[in-house]
């Protein structure tokens, strides 16, 4: 059972992946994926070497067909000649034959339940008959694959993607976390029947709410079935730069904080070796909590992660709490008076220690800063006696997620309905460190439906950057849009254009369209699905060709790559969503 008020890794079985086992008491592993062509042996070897030198435990390559799967043996041999002996992973979509070939050459093969056994509905079958027929095909085809893996001593990752669920699962369960879990469990049951334990599971989505909900639901289902397979954690299509780091830290960090996860990948639209130090920083930050005691709370079993408490608070000042969007308070007690006029905080905590909104002193609102040790019965009575109170919950301990939960739980047990602002002081001197730490900490609570706002104190960093981060965390948790949302994949060997360059060009042209979501995807495997809630999409369709989407519908096909960004702009203008700078 997970400890919501402390840190303890979830107990999992061990999956043997070459000489680098996963799960159990082994360290949480870090990995990345190559983005060069798998048929370019030298480029693949060189890139894998850079990823390994950065600290990766595993390196994954796409194998979209049998010939790519065959070439994995040459990549493996090239790495061995250079003295690199870590396990390689093949990433398979749509081609069971490629998966079977890959088993001969690498230590682990990732398959996608959404497209491993392709079953199209048709004929005169009822929905139930079609579902059962597909289930039978999965048992037969995947069962045979599992037996091959057992015979060869290979591991399998069952990699479920929100954007590529099978037609069967979508028809029955919809585009939901439940659909992802059912898709996974169908394949896990086959592994269980064949007594195959070298299994790793991933449940990925670009939406942090969907991803974390799916992982937590899967853990519950596995525990109920006495299954304890290790988990690969990641947010797919997280993007690049600050946004990619924030979104990854919110999703991965909130699960790691509860001890969930045996290997992680931070998927960035950057060179893959850049992912590794980010993952290492995030993991090291969470693991500092290991060995520290849990926070003592009354009636811990009554803490309900899934009940949305945010809207149960009352409104203060007509803009805080209740159904109002979460706010950002900027701590300017150190005297910094620089602001980004396009992204102003809702409230400023001034150098005089008082709270201001649009330069007006908030005289009629009581801001009460409280730490864990302050939250006594007398304190609670005082809070309840004063109307228009906003509680600033300040975490000062090693485990802010557990500390905030404990304080929120105490307030909820007492029936306190004051709006709550999450606050923590960070001693970071590096902005990336702050992005990862604050996103993991505050994101975990926001994803639970708690917290009416944020205040991040980081005196050693520019206040404008800290303010920007706070808004980024609210956007990554899908609570408040303040900038253009980019859903961009990290690219892989299936991508046939320069994704990093394209992301930069699209951002330069559209970053001022702050209410839009734009998907930028390397190929069709996850593209249309993962960007399903995007307003517009840019998807690789073949060598030098791009398809453009309006929401879920492809509206322009096979556009030459050199014209595609301009045509995307024209498409946005045609639909009335363009604004001049």
Swiss-Prot record:
GO MF annotation: an example: 4-hydroxy-3-methylbut-2-enyl-diphosphate synthase activity (flavodoxin)
Sites where the protein binds [4Fe-4S] cluster: 489, 492, 523, 530
Give the matching InterPro entries: Dihydropteroate_synth-like_sf, IspG_atypical, IspG_bac-typ, NO2/SO3_Rdtase_4Fe4S_sf
Q: How is the cofactor bound?
A: Binds 1 [4Fe-4S] cluster.
What Gene3D superfamilies does UniProt report for this protein, alphabetically? Dihydropteroate synthase-like (3.20.20.20), Sulfite Reductase Hemoprotein, domain 1 (3.30.413.10)
Q: What class of enzyme is it?
A: oxidoreductase
Q: Which reaction does it catalyse?
A: (2E)-4-hydroxy-3-methylbut-2-enyl diphosphate + oxidized [flavodoxin] + H2O + 2 H(+) = 2-C-methyl-D-erythritol 2,4-cyclic diphosphate + reduced [flavodoxin]
What is the E.C. number? 1.17.7.3
Q: In which pathway does it act?
A: Isoprenoid biosynthesis; isopentenyl diphosphate biosynthesis via DXP pathway; isopentenyl diphosphate from 1-deoxy-D-xylulose 5-phosphate: step 5/6
One GO BP annotation of this record:
isopentenyl diphosphate biosynthetic process, methylerythritol 4-phosphate pathway
**What HAMAP family has UniProt attached to this entry?**
IspG (MF_00159)
Q: What does this protein do?
A: Converts 2C-methyl-D-erythritol 2,4-cyclodiphosphate (ME-2,4cPP) into 1-hydroxy-2-methyl-2-(E)-butenyl 4-diphosphate.
Regarding protein family, the annotation reads:
Belongs to the IspG family.
Q: What is this protein called?
A: 4-hydroxy-3-methylbut-2-en-1-yl diphosphate synthase (flavodoxin)
What is the species listed in this Swiss-Prot or TrEMBL entry? Porphyromonas gingivalis (strain ATCC BAA-308 / W83)
Give me the gene this protein comes from.
Answer: ispG
């Amino acid at each position: 059972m997970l400890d919501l008020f402390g840190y303890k890794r979830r107990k999992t079985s061990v999956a043997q992946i070459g000489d680098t086992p996963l799960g159990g008491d082994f360290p949480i592993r870090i990995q990345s994926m190559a983005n060069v062509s798998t048929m370019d042996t030298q480029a693949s070897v060189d890139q894998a070497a850079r990823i390994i030198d950065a600290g990766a435990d595993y390196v994954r390559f796409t194998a979209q067909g049998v010939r790519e799967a065959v070439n994995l043996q040459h990549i493996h041999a090239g790495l061995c000649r250079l003295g690199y002996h870590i396990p390689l992973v093949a990433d398979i979509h749509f081609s069971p034959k490629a998966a079977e070939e890959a088993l001969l050459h690498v230590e682990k093969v990732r398959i996608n339940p959404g497209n491993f056994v392709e079953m199209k509905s048709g004929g005169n079958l009822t929905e139930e008959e079609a579902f059962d027929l597909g289930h039978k095909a999965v048992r037969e085809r995947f069962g045979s694959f599992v037996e091959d893996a057992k015979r060869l001593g290979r591991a399998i990752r069952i990699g479920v993607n929100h954007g590529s669920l099978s037609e069967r699962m979508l028809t029955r369960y919809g585009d939901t976390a439940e659909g992802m879990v059912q898709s996974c469990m169908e394949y896990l049951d086959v592994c269980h029947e064949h007594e195959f334990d070298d299994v790793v599971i991933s449940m990925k989505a670009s939406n942090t709410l969907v991803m974390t909900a799916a992982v937590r639901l899967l853990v519950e289902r596995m525990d109920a079935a006495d299954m304890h397979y290790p988990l690969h954690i990641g947010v797919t299509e997280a993007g690049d730069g600050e946004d990619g780091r924030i979104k990854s830290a919110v999703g991965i960090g909130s699960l790691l904080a509860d001890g969930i996860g045996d290997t992680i990948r931070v998927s960035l639209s950057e060179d893959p070796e850049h992912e590794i130090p980010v993952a290492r920083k995030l993991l090291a930050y969470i693991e500092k909590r290991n060995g520290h005691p849990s926070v003592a709370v009354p009636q811990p079993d009554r803490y309900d992660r899934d009940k949305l408490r945010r809207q149960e608070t009352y409104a203060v000042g007509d803009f805080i709490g209740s159904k109002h969007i979460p706010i950002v308070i900027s701590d300017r007690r150190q005297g910094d008076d620089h602001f980004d006029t396009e992204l102003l905080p809702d409230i400023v905590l001034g150098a005089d220690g008082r709270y201001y909104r649009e330069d007006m002193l908030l005289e009629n609102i009581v801001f009460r800063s409280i730490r864990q040790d302050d939250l006594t019965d007398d304190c609670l009575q005082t809070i309840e006696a004063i109307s228009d109170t906003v509680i600033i919950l300040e975490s000062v301990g090693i485990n802010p997620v557990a500390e905030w939960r404990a304080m929120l739980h105490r307030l909820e047990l007492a029936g306190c309905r004051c709006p709550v602002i999450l606050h923590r002081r960070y001693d970071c001197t590096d902005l990336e460190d702050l992005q990862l730490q604050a996103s993991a900490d505050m994101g975990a609570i926001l994803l639970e439906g708690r917290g009416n706002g944020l205040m991040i104190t980081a005196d050693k960093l520019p206040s404008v950057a800290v303010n920007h981060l706070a808004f980024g965390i609210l956007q990554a948790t899908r609570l408040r849009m303040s900038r253009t949302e980019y859903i961009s994949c990290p690219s892989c060997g299936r991508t046939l254009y320069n994704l990093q360059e394209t992301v930069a060009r699209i951002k330069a042209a559209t970053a001022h369209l702050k209410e839009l979501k734009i998907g930028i995807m390397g190929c069709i495997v996850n593209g249309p699905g993962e960007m399903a809630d995007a307003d517009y999409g840019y998807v690789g369709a073949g060598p030098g060709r791009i398809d453009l989407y309006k929401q879920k519908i492809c509206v322009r096909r096979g556009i030459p790559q050199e014209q595609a960004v301009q045509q995307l702009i024209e498409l946005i203008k045609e639909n009335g969503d363009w604004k001049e700078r």
